Amino acid sequence: MRRTLFILALAAVVAVAAGATALGATHVSTVDPTGFSARVDNPWFPLQPGTTYVYTGTKDGKPARDVLQVTHRTATIDGAPCVVVKDRLYLSGRLEERTTDWYTQDRKGNVWYFGEQTSSALDKSGKPVTTGTWKAGVDGAKPGIYMFANPRVGQQAQQEFYKGQAEDHFQVLSLRSPVTVPYVSSKNALLTKEWTPLEPGVLDHKLYVRGIGTVLEEAVKGGTERLALVSVHRGA
């Protein structure tokens, strides 16, 4: 019951945030853990099990390669069934970070982010750095909307919340943004901006192509990261 009430409250907060834009009246969604599915087929962020996305570019001034794999595994996080996504980031050919992400979708088609388990380069004591790791329902961590079912310009939401560790937000900027990456070109990409109060002055843009998902991520302020989609392999 605690989980259900919490997610209802969070949905209301997200709805109010979206309604506070020029889109019109606010509304409250009545979602709960039983209303989620590990089948994520939102056209702007589809997560079909067996699919592998490969991105290349630069990060922190180094050649970067990011491999994102949608597994056939599911996990129950704070009562909600989530698809398990593995993410491996290589810098200058060396594995820099491993991340396990948990996503789920509500009945309306919104994609929710329920947490991540992160392990990056070793610290001075030889232990892997796990900063940014969080799981909905643990130690006050809360899930957030990662992608709207029907994105509209001006919509915004908090994607995650674990105080002092994970506080990303995003806002829809355009539904007709041109983009060209090695894998695809489109004149109707979805453009968003992302930011976090934990890194003031840092702003990222992401572009999504319908039916594919994320095709480009780049820092536009306070960073040098740029990762573009180069291949998509859809396995069994």
Regions found by a protein language model. Give the residues of each.
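C-terminal region of N-terminal signal peptides and the immediate post-cleavage residues
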Residues: 16-26
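Conserved functional acidic sites
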Residues: 25-236
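Bacterial N-terminal signal peptides that target proteins for export
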Residues: 1-9
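Bacterial N-terminal signal peptides
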Residues: 8-18
